[in-house]
Every structure is written in C-alpha cells, then in structure tokens.
C-alpha cells in the first residue's frame, strides 16, 4: 500500500487503463496529460546557477492547468489579492444555488449550455429581486463561482455567489439591510427554479440539447416532460450563510472557493494496485470526516467529471462588480460609505518577489551558500548536470 501519494501518482497508475476502456473528451484528455506531466520536465525547465559557488539548480515547469492540484495556489493568491481593490467595508453574504439531482444526467450531457443556464438563472434572480423596491430597490454586486462536485467527487453542480449586502438606487444613494439578508429564501427558490427550468425548456425546444448515457431517455418528449414536472414539484433549496465579519474575511473566503478543484492532494490517504482511499465529509453525520475506498478507475472517472468545457469561465462578476461598472460605481460606493480602499499587495510584483512575500522563500538565493542565483539563457544548450552538482 502506497502512503503519501498524490493525485499525479493516482493518474500515473490508473489513467492509461481507464483511457483504453472509456470515452474521454478532448478537454479531459488534455487535463489528464497535464496532471501526469506537471513538474516532470515535459513542459520545459528553468536552469539557474549560483554566481558564487557555481551550484546548478534545475526547476521543472508546471502545467498551469486549472484542474491540476499542484498549480492552483499561486494563481489563487494573485486573483484574490487583485479582488482586494473591489471589496467594500460593507455586509456580504454567501448564497448557494443548487438544482435537483434528477437534472444531473442531462446537465452532464450538456455542460456548456446548462452550466451557463445556472449562471443566467442565479444572476437574473439576484439582480431582478434586488432591484425590486419591495426588497431593496438597488443595483447590487456579486461574484458567481461554479462548483460541480460534492465531497465524494460525485456530480453535484451548484453556484456559490458572494453577494454585496447593499447597493445603489436609481438616485445613486446607498441602501442596505444591515446584517440581515435582503431577500427571502423562498422567493429566491421559486424565482431561480422558474428561470432555470424556462431556459432548459427553451434549449430542448430549439433542439440544442444532446442526450448521452443516462440522459438518453430524455430525448423522448414525454419522458422529458415528466422530468420537468418532477423538478417543478420539488422545492429547490438555495441557502444563505451568515454574513462575513469584515472585508478581510470576504477576501479569505474568496480564496477558499475560487480556485478549488474536486479534490486536493492532502485528502488522498493511500493507494494500492487496484484502489484509492481518500477522506470526505459525511453530511449525514454533521460533516464529520470519513475515509472512502474506491477502485482506481472509479477515482479517475469521478475526477474527470469535473473538468470544465474548453475556455469555460467559472468565475463571473455581475452588477456593481462587473468590469463595465466597477471602476466608477465601486469608487462611488466607497466614497458614500467612507470606507478605505484595500490596496493590492502583489500588484506590479514579479514572481520571485511574490514568492518571497507569501512563502518567505527567496528563490534568487542559492540554497547552498546564500549567493545570488542567475538564470541561464533559455537558448543556451544545457547538459544535464551530475547528481552531486544539483542543489
């Protein structure tokens, strides 16, 4: 039994046999290749030498794939830091939009269309209800993030929305509801359900949907109509978490949700010739952690379910936080509220400086003597050094 193994190790052992027996999309195949070859030299190397002692360092490049567990931390820190300048010292709420599990097969067969429909339904629900004078009567700002997994890597598409708890009315006056969320959850539920189902029906009527695997029965009109009736009869359950405790907690929370993938390396507990054991939360037991063992190929199947379609944008900004509005309107909100501007810490810093600040590691210093390291020209031919020469 292998302990201290990584997702890369799991892919090396089980992906080749999985690929030979399963249908895999180009995006999934590309993600698998990137994960297996990240930091192996397949994506090139950076070679540097110490000016003082001559010690040579070879750094293998990462794949930078958004599904790779080894490539998320640095982009996450940069993205979250850039969002500092958009954050107000005002109430924020975390709203989660989910759909009935009966829709999962048809969503998985039509990811690009039906993931996009999730954004449309969630954003239209929040914007339209917030603009209604019965609730707040303002233009609000929020960020929507798509996650497609549950704790066991099951298929569970849902939207996380980080919502500003106030906004600007038609006269550009600030309005909020204090620490209480300004929209009733039941109203959100009914509105979101209506909007998502309307777009799903429109896609079906326009013959835009595909029906693969367990979604095949829904190609029949009567079976599809029965699915719609089942989903309409259900109570869709979005939920709102308690407000954030200040702007810094919003920034930390964004880091928790934005660049997450289906499972991280620390949750992989062990691997055998045939199985993988990982930890997951058991929500039937108040979210307590438990260990789950599944076959290696089943692990690969579950992981690849969460590779997004090519060029699909998972993080989207709306209202006051949209790229069209935020420069003027967030500045206006900040002036009205009299709150300070949170300045980006990493703006205009190069990679070595960011690494030094975040991880207290100076990659420009030799690990042997502390001397200055310089990079060798990329076009220079380089002979692989002997092991004793490597730092």
For every predicted segment, state its role.
Residues 1-391:
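Beta->alpha loop/short-helix hinge microenvironment recognizer with preference
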């Amino acid at each position: 039994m292998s302990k201290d193994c990584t997702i890369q190790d799991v892919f090396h052992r089980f992906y080749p046999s999985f690929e030979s027996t399963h249908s895999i999309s180009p995006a999934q195949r590309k993600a698998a290749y990137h994960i297996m070859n990240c930091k192996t030299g397949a994506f090139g190397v950076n070679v540097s030498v110490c000016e003082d002692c001559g010690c040579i360092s070879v750094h293998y490049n990462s794949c930078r794939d958004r599904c790779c567990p080894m490539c998320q931390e640095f982009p996450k820190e940069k993205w979250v830091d850039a969002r500092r300048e958009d954050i107000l010292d005002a109430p924020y709420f975390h709203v989660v939009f989910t759909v009935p599990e009966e829709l999962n097969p048809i969503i998985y067969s039509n990811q690009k269309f039906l993931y996009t429909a999730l954004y449309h339904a969630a954003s239209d629900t929040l914007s339209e209800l917030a603009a209604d004078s019965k609730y707040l009567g303002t233009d609000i700002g929020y960020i929507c993030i798509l996650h497609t997994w549950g704790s066991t890597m099951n298929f569970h598409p849902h939207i996380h929305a980080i919502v500003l708890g106030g906004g600007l009315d038609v006269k550009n006056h600030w309005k909020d509801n204090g620490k209480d969320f300004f929209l009733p959850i039941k109203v959100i539920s009914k509105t979101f359900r209506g909007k998502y189902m309307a777009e799903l029906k429109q896609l079906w009527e326009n013959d835009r949907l595909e029906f693969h695997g367990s979604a095949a029965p829904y190609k029949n009109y009567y079976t599809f109509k029965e699915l719609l009736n089942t989903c309409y009869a259900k109570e869709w359950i979005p939920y709102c978490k308690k407000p954030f405790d200040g702007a810094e907690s919003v920034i930390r929370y964004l880091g928790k949700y934005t660049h997450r993938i289906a499972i991280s390396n620390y949750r992989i507990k062990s691997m055998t010739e045939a199985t993988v054991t990982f930890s997951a939360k058991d929500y039937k037991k108040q979210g307590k952690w438990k260990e789950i063992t599944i076959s290696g190929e089943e692990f690969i199947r579950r992981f690849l379910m969460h590779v997004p379609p090519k060029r699909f944008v998972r993080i989207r900004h709306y209202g006051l936080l949209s790229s069209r509005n935020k420069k003027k309107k967030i500045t206006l909100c900040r002036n009205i509220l009299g709150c300070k501007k949170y300045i980006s810490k990493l703006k205009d810093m190069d990679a070595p400086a960011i690494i030094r600040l975040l991880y207290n590691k100076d990659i420009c210093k030799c690990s042997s003597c502390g001397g200055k390291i310089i990079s060798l020209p990329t076009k220079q031919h380089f002979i692989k050094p002997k092991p004793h020469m490597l730092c």
